[in-house]
């Protein structure tokens, strides 16, 4: 959505809607061609539902992706965004989304262990930014999120 809402240039974003960890090899190769100094990752929502509450599997899969990225782009600095919380209406439809806090706790610990950046975006989230589905964000959220990532990475 960063490019869709003209927040970031398409030449600096590698993204695919609805993708799972197991499908990231093409995106990693695309990113490698860009030779980035900094990589921001924002994965998880689809894999939270796919792992059905298995936080350890989620962390293992995320860790494997980071290993691939580090191998492909060893000089890049990696920052992992926390999985965004969802509104209660979304949890009612998809109960696996109820324990996102557990995922983020282990995600932060994984980042610490790997000595990579972790971005807790909880301070920028407001109910008004959510779309009706209670999961996705409206266009006005993305500039705020981009600013937060830039701030954390000291860009």
Task: Indicate where each model-derived feature is located.
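Short amphipathic alpha-helical segments and helix-helix/interface helices
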Residues: 28, 66, 104-108
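N-terminal cationic-hydrophobic initiation segments that often serve targeting/anchoring roles
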Residues: 32, 70-71
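Conserved SGNH/GDSL esterase-like catalytic core that processes O-acyl groups on lipids
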Residues: 1-60
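Catalytic His-Asp segment of secreted/periplasmic serine-dependent ester chemistry enzymes
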Residues: 85-155
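A non-catalytic structural micro-motif
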Residues: 73-80, 149
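Helix C-cap/helix->beta junction micro-motif
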Residues: 72-73, 114
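Structural recognition of the beta-strand scaffold that forms the well-ordered cores
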Residues: 38-42, 47, 77-82, 117-120
């Amino acid at each position: 959505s960063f490019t869709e809402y003209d927040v970031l240039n398409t030449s600096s974003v590698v993204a695919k809607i609805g993708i799972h960890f197991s499908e990231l090899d093409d995106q990693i190769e695309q990113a490698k061609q860009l030779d980035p100094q900094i990589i921001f990752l924002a994965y998880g929502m689809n894999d939270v539902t796919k792992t059905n509450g298995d936080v350890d599997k989620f962390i293992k899969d995320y860790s494997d992706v980071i290993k691939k990225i580090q191998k492909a782009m060893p000089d890049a600095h990696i920052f992992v965004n926390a999985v965004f919380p969802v509104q209660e209406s979304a949890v009612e439809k998809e109960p696996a989304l109820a324990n996102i806090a557990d995922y983020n706790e282990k995600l932060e610990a994984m980042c610490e262990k790997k000595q990579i950046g972790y971005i807790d975006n909880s301070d920028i989230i407001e109910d008004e930014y959510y779309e009706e589905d209670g999961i996705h964000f409206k266009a006005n959220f993305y500039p705020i999120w981009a600013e937060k990532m830039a701030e954390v990475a000291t860009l």
